[in-house]
Amino acid sequence: MQENPTVWLFDLDNTLHDADAGIFTLINRAMTGYIAQRLRLSDQAASDLRQEYWHRYGATLAGLQIHHPEIDIAEFLRESHPIDEILTRLHGMPETQNTLSRLKGRKAVFSNGPSFYVRAVSDALGLTESFDALFGTDDFGLLYKPNPQAYLNVCRLLDVPPERCVMVDDSADNLHQAKALGMKTVWFGAKSHALPFIDASVSDMAQLAQYAETLSEHRQTHYNTP
């Protein structure tokens, strides 16, 4: 049996599926509409507030929790993630299932989205059986990457130290925090490149599979660096 097996932590949006193909636009519009209705703001003012909280706190809901405690969290998450419409715009990443099958160790989804959204998207992509666990923000304390406690809570749920984890994410900020906690880091996406806290930069799932084969060599790997 392998000693200290690796645990792979995967972001969801723009890592396991292409959220920029329309899903983020849909979610942002739904969030803006909800904020406008509940706080009695114009659409423009609600959009500005949504973006301000996202930039300031890492998630719109985090800002709402701080400044508008009267907001019903479950209602906000439900209204801002219209699942039926989201699934009509879902575009998975090529070679995902094949790559997941080649990764040694446990695998989990670690997303800032709500758990019902994580499960619905994973099911629709046919990926649920490839993972040992699926985590949305309400599973680890309504926290959000890059809050360090979010990572530690997920590690606790998996009963694994951060040092045994590999974080795969399209966000450099999220990976910077993962590295600070001792995780290996894989920056996923066409815009990824070499940075001091990045162990590997990959543009697609095929390159991730290649990196996984070199994991024991403890070296930086950047497939898409100019």
Model feature map: region roles:
Residues 2-94, 116:
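N-terminal helical cap/lid subdomain that shapes the substrate entry/recognition surface
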Residues 1-6, 101, 114-226:
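Asp-based, Mg2+/Mn2+-dependent phosphohydrolase catalytic module
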Residues 75-88, 96-125, 134-137:
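Substrate-recognition element of Asp-dependent hydrolases with the DxDx(T/V) motif
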Residues 41, 70-71, 105, 127, ...:
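Short, well-ordered coil loops that connect the C-terminus of an alpha-helix to the N-terminus
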